[in-house]
Amino acid sequence: MGKGIDGLKLKKRSEKLAFMEVKIGSTSSYCRLEGFTTQAFNANASEYNRQYVDEDTERTDVKGYSESINYNFDQYIGHPALSEIVKITENELTGTDAVRNILTVDMTSNTSGGQYEATLSAFAIVPSSNGDSTDCMTYSGDFKSRGTKRAVQVTMDADFENATIVGGSTVASQSAKSTEKNVEVKK
């Protein structure tokens, strides 16, 4: 049996945090997505499959991705990010009104400067169901990719409730450009 991983630390699911861009007043802030019972990432890779006449096996290439995140959460009244998703669901928002930027932060990538590696993407919030529990109000659906994913560096507040993008890379895709001027950016 292999023992190469015996001395290594296993990465916990709780060490990958998500933050949604929420407009508060005249600025936007990345608020932590809390209260989620499911946040499953799906690559949804597009494939090009073919078999050449002189070969007995197929060949496969990945030609693109359409990432989605399946979600379920318990509603906490007054939580800004959850309130955004509830607003989109309850008001049946469509088009760019249902698009939000989401940061996914790797908490194991902390540097000596207090920065973390993260990815920034614009997602369409696609609601599925709500109210399917008698324990509390629940919502479910999918965040579906709306463009190119971008690598960024972020800092966190003391409680890990808010993330701030470091530098000038705030745009995840063209659909997110309208919020670029309102995002707090540290330089």
Language model segments and positions:
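Solvent-exposed edge beta-strands and adjacent loop segments
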Residues: G2-I77, F123-D135
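Short secondary-structure transition/capping segments
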Residues: K9-K16, R146-F160
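Short beta-strand and beta-hairpin "edge-sheet" elements
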Residues: Q39, T104-A151
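Residues at beta-strand starts and edge strands
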Residues: Y65-I69, D97-N101, M137-Y139
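Short, cysteine-centered beta-strand-loop-beta hairpins and adjacent loop/turn segments enriched
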Residues: Y76-L82, K149-Q153
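Short, acidic/charged, Gly/Pro-enriched secondary-structure junctions
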Residues: L82-E117
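Short, low-complexity, polar/charged sequence segments that are solvent-exposed and flexible
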Residues: I88-T94, S121-I125, D142-K144, E161-I165
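Intrinsically disordered, low-complexity terminal/linker regions enriched in Pro/Ser/Gly
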Residues: V154-K187
